[in-house]
Amino acid sequence: LGQENTIIDVSNAYFDTIHRWLPMVSKKRLDMGLPLQNAGPDLAMLFLAMKLITEPVTPVPDLTLYREAKTFVALLESDGVISLFLLQAMILIAVYEFGHAIYPAAWMTTGACARYSDILGIGPGDFTILEQVVSQIGRHLCGIVS
């Protein structure tokens, strides 16, 4: 991702495309967040997943970025990072895997997302985390896939 302009381009590409049918990441929350240079690795992972999911489809996909994203998720998990940003990144990776027919990884990642949401206290019909997000950013609701 490197430079701030790249992150802005990735964010714009994501919100212009994927976000239209999977409104899971709050643009307002990202815009109100910390300056990018002060952000944590979980936010960097989310931007990496946003870049991955918005990459143009090619006849023979280059899986380098995908492998880097999977490795970064594993590193964050082993470091004990628990955050909504990381869950959102994992969901985007699962969508990428399903879209590119990367099996059984797609099922494994989906299962990991379900278990990770349990750690965050997000369950079917449980909107506690949403209420916390809404209180932080006003009436803007951030959707979550459960």
Protein language model features and the residues they cover:
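Acidic, Ser/Thr-rich, low-complexity intrinsically disordered regions in fungal proteins
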Residues: 4-146
